[in-house]
Regions:
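Long, continuous compositionally biased terminal/linker segments
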Residues: 232-254
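Intrinsically disordered, serine/threonine/proline
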Residues: 1-3
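Acyl-donor binding region in acyl/amide transferases
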Residues: 81-214, 220-228, 240
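Short amphipathic alpha-helix that is part of the acyltransferase structural core
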Residues: 5-73, 80
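Short low-complexity, flexible loop/linker segments enriched in glycine and/or proline
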Residues: 54, 159-163, 231-235
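Short, well-ordered beta-strand micro-motif
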Residues: 64-66, 77, 232-236
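Beta-rich nucleic-acid/ligand-interaction surfaces
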Residues: 49-56, 153, 223-232
Length: 254
C-alpha cells in the first residue's frame, strides 16, 4: 500500500464505516473479498491463497467499508496521478490510450476493484463509498475520477441494450484502445433500445457515474483473463451537477 499517501479520517453513515486500509491484515481482507467477486463469481480458477492480488495493489490506497460489527461489506482501491504523463502507470493504461486526458488540469484519481458483499444494502454501501471518494477527490485536488467499469462475462449480446445506450448517449472518442479484442459501440444511433432494459444491464457503479455526468469509451474491451467486458469510464469533477456535488459533500462531511 502507498504508505506516503494522505489519508482522510473514517467516515460513518447509515450503519456503515468507510476507512482507509492500514497494514497487511486489512489488505488481505480486501483481497479475499475481491476473490469472491472477481474470481469465484466470475467462474475463474481459484487462486491457491484465496486472494485476488496484482502488481497494482502496493501502489494503491485501499478503502474498506464495514458494518457496525466490523464485518467487511465493501472495498475498493484508488491511485492518484499528479500529471498526464504519469497515467501510463495506471491499471487502465493496460487497455486504453489515455493521451486523450491530457487536456485536463489537475490530478487524476483512478478507482478500481470496487465490490460489495451480496447481502449488503447496495444503496447504503454505494452512498458511503461515494462519500469517501468525495473526500479523496478533495484531498488530492483531482480533476477527474476514472477507471474500468466491468460487465460480467464476455458475451456482448447480454448487454446489447446497454451498449446501444452507452454508444448513443454517453460515449466519447477521446479514449482509444490498446487491447487486442474490443467491441465498438454505435455512436450515431439516435434511438437506443428501451432505456429501462438498458439501465438494468448497466452495473450500479457505472449507473452512478453516468447520473453525475460521467462518460465512457466508444468501445468495450474483452478481458478474457478477468472474464469480463469493460469500458473506460471518466467523471470530470467540474461536470458534476451542483445539486449532486452538494449531496456528495454532505455525505463526505458526515
Amino acid at each position: 500500500m502507498n504508505s506516503d499517501a494522505r489519508h482522510p479520517v473514517p467516515l460513518a453513515r447509515g450503519g456503515y464505516v468507510a476507512r482507509m486500509a492500514v497494514g497487511r491484515e486489512d489488505l488481505r481482507a480486501a483481497q479475499a473479498m475481491r476473490h469472491v467477486s472477481f474470481v469465484d463469481a466470475a467462474g475463474r480458477e481459484a487462486m491457491a491463497d484465496g486472494l485476488d492480488q496484482d502488481a497494482y495493489d502496493p501502489l494503491c490506497d485501499h478503502v474498506l467499508i464495514e458494518d457496525t460489527n466490523g464485518r467487511l461489506v465493501g472495498c475498493y482501491r484508488v491511485q492518484f496521478f499528479a500529471a498526464p504523463e504519469d497515467l501510463s502507470n495506471s491499471y487502465s493504461a493496460q487497455y486504453y490510450n489515455l493521451d486523450g486526458l491530457s487536456y485536463l488540469r489537475g490530478g487524476f484519481l483512478e478507482l478500481g476493484r470496487f465490490c460489495v458483499t451480496s447481502d449488503a444494502a447496495d444503496s447504503d454501501v454505494l452512498r458511503i463509498a461515494w462519500g469517501m471518494l468525495a473526500r479523496l477527490v478533495d484531498l488530492y485536488g483531482a480533476a477527474i475520477l476514472f477507471g474500468c467499469s466491468s460487465f460480467s462475462g464476455t458475451d456482448p449480446s447480454c448487454y446489447a441494450a446497454a451498449f446501444d445506450l452507452l454508444g448513443a448517449k454517453h460515449a466519447s472518442p477521446r479514449i482509444s484502445t490498446l487491447a487486442d479484442e474490443t467491441i465498438g459501440f454505435q455512436t450515431s444511433q439516435k434511438n437506443p433500445a428501451d432505456r429501462a432494459v438498458a439501465l438494468g444491464q448497466i452495473p450500479p457503479l457505472l449507473r452512478t457515474y453516468l447520473s453525475m455526468g460521467g462518460w465512457v469509451s466508444d468501445h468495450a474491451v474483452v478481458d478474457r483473463e478477468m472474464n469480463t467486458l469493460h469500458v473506460f469510464t471518466g467523471l470530470e469533477i467540474a461536470a458534476i451537477p451542483p445539486a449532486r456535488a452538494k449531496a456528495l459533500r454532505a455525505i463526505a462531511n458526515g
